[in-house]
Design a protein with these regions (language model features):
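Short, aromatic/basic amphipathic alpha-helical patches
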Residues: 88-98
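Charged DNA-binding/catalytic regions of mobile-element recombinases
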Residues: 27, 59-67, 104-106, 114-116, ...
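RNase H-like polynucleotidyl transferase catalytic core
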Residues: 15-21, 99-118, 132
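Acidic/histidine-rich, metal-coordinating catalytic segments
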Residues: 65, 74-87, 109, 114
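Short glycine-/polar-rich loops that comprise or flank the Walker A/P-loop
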Residues: 26-28, 74, 99-102
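Generic structural signal for small/hydrophobic residues in well-ordered secondary structure
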Residues: 32-34, 65, 81, 114, ...
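Extended, low-complexity cationic-aromatic segments
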Residues: 1-66, 168-179
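C-terminal anion-handling pockets and recognition modules
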Residues: 117-179
Length: 179
């Protein structure tokens, strides 16, 4: 949303700072995925932004999965949270048609296990606090820049997985490293 997340500021006593925003209800939705290659343990991040003031729907989620599917070679295990849109009919139909995709669901109500939720928190609380875009185009440009910056930080992407406490043992049986 265009209403900024306000963290901290300073002002003389009695002079409360006021942040002026032009479109307080404008918003952009984002879908994203962290990928980890089994051979080299290379971490990457893929994302897609919605149209202005709209949500993702089953077909747009499938388009995003197709994007990741085209970019990543070999079998894919998708760790998926249980948000309703991820269980939409177009999405489940896509999974049924593409056997190269293995879908594992996170337990219900467990956002702390989802490393992509750590991406959202990092960008919101560390990269965009107090940021007040003038319009949705400016917000879209800044979000895109932050996600491209994040792609260049595999160490940070790895830390998002490590923060969850999840182990990649079933995926990498010869390596007991916990992320």
């Amino acid at each position: 949303m265009l209403a900024p997340l306000l963290r901290r500021t300073w002002a003389p006593r009695g002079c409360t700072p006021v942040v002026k925003i032009s479109e307080p209800h404008g918003r952009i939705s984002v879908i994203g995925a962290i990928t980890i290659s089994p051979e080299r343990r290379h971490f990457s991040f893929y994302f897609q932004l919605s149209a202005d003031n709209s949500n993702f729907h089953g077909e747009s989620v499938v388009q995003f999965i197709e994007l990741v599917h085209r970019k990543v070679r070999g079998p894919i295990t998708l760790l998926w949270d249980r948000i309703l849109i991820h269980r939409a009919k177009p999405v489940t139909d896509y999974f049924a048609r593409h056997r190269r995709l293995v879908v594992e669901m996170f337990p219900p109500y467990a956002p702390e296990l989802n490393p992509v939720d750590n991406v959202w928190s990092y960008v919101k609380y560390n990269r965009l606090p107090n940021y007040t875009p003038r319009n949705l185009d400016e917000l879209r440009e800044r979000i895109t820049a932050e996600f491209y910056r994040l792609r260049k930080r595999p160490d940070l992407l790895k830390s998002f997985l490590k923060h969850t406490g999840l182990s990649l043992d079933p995926i990498y049986p010869n390596d007991s490293e916990t992320y």
